Amino acid sequence: MKLNKYIDHTLLKQDAKKKQIDSLLSEAREYDFASVCVNPTWVEHAKKGLEGTDAKVCTVVGFPLGATTSAVKAFETKEAIQNGADEIDMVINVGALKSGNLALVESDIRAVVEASGDKLVKVIIEACLLTDQEKIVVCQLAQKAGADFVKTSTGFSTGGATIADVRLMCETVGSDMGVKAAGGARSYADALAFVEAGATRIGTSAGVAILKGELADGDY
């Protein structure tokens, strides 16, 4: 199994330096990862750094709280794509979901999907904050809104991906959508377990260590 093609090689820390981003890009070129995932401010730099490779540039929208308005998320999406983003990982409005305002949750996702054009949209549900029923509901809403993936976590909340969450999300969306496990893979065994549970993408800062079969010390 080519695990490298499952990995979104990630650096989303707010204090990330240019040299760290450059290292991320160099590793993506060397290990042929599916994508790099960086904050919007680094998208243009990442696009230039990955020219001539198959690696995509993934960025985040409404990150990490999901509490900006739909209009702001749509603008972020459009600007990111103009700057070279190939994939958008957006955070849902968790508060709206918890309040039972499902129409707002769906329209919020749809705003990003519509702004993204033909680019891939992954919907971060922040599973660690949700009940199982809420996880099911929001995955269904993401599917209804036309998103391409559901994603477990930002990596900035109280927990990351779990095998149980990945299985539940896969069962909910079926084969129509991808499932991204983020914030829980720190070793080759972890990554393999997520793939075996149904994950089609893994978000991690430990991509190199995973491929080397080493235990990583990163949180995301």
UniProtKB/Swiss-Prot annotation:
It catalyses: 2-deoxy-D-ribose 5-phosphate = D-glyceraldehyde 3-phosphate + acetaldehyde. The active site is at residues 89, 151, 180. The keyword Lyase applies. Its EC number is 4.1.2.4. Its main location: cytoplasm. InterPro entries: Aldolase_TIM, DeoC, DeoC/FbaB/LacD_aldolase, DeoC_typeI. Keywords: Cytoplasm, Lyase, Schiff base. The keyword Lyase applies. This is Deoxyribose-phosphate aldolase. The gene is deoC.
